[in-house]
């Protein structure tokens, strides 16, 4: 089931505000241009197709995913990491964008959760698996994973009371989104601290 019309319409209306916020916090013109391209396209070419894709939010989630990312890189498996914050971007690159992983690792910002952008991202990168670290969940990101038959996992999840209340307010959106997750490796049920937890 596709995401609701009202959700996609709201994202389209908010796009100028989102772009304005990115421009205000940009430190250099080059960084601004790069972030806008990664969030709104046209997207840069994939370094490797069929990578294991980790979506992390910021530094904490990057650190939590580090053992799993290292496991795949050491095994010669390409890894793609997307983030939503500048600090998360910097942390991921400092950890992995260096020898001996330069040819296997790629880090970019997660595109805005608009259908056409997310669909284009899946088509360009063709990931083997999507692992969502923690609980930053985007409806079109998950919906298109199902559309492109990309297994989608939720790992190391902690749902705060604030987040739970927020999700409860939009059950029509979140219920379908959560049903599309093929596995929920919530920390309370099964700790995802070993690479075997998400082996495809």
Task: Give each language-model segment a name.
Residues 1-22, 26, 175:
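Short hydrophobic helices that act as membrane-entry/anchoring signals
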Residues 19, 23-39, 45-200:
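Active-site and donor-binding regions of nucleotide-sugar-utilizing enzymes
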């Amino acid at each position: 089931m596709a995401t609701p019309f009202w959700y996609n319409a709201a994202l389209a209306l908010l796009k100028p505000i989102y772009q304005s916020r990115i421009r205000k916090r940009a430190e250099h013109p080059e960084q601004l241009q790069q972030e806008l391209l990664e969030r709104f396209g046209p997207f840069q070419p994939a370094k490797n197709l069929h990578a294991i894709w980790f979506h992390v939010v910021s530094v904490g989630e990057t650190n939590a995913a580090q053992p799993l990312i290292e496991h795949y890189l050491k095994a010669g498996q390409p890894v793609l990491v997307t983030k939503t914050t500048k600090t998360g971007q910097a942390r991921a690159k400092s950890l992995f964008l260096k020898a001996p992983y330069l040819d296997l690792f790629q880090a970019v910002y997660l595109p805005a959760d608009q259908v056409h952008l997310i669909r284009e991202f899946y088509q360009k990168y063709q990931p083997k698996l999507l692992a969502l670290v923690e609980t930053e969940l985007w409806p079109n990101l998950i919906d298109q994973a199902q559309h492109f038959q990309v297994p989608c996992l939720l790992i190391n999840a902690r749902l705060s009371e604030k987040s739970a209340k927020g999700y409860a307010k939009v059950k029509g959106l979140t219920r379908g989104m959560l049903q599309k997750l093929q596995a929920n490796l919530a920390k309370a049920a099964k700790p995802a601290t070993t690479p075997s937890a998400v082996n495809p």
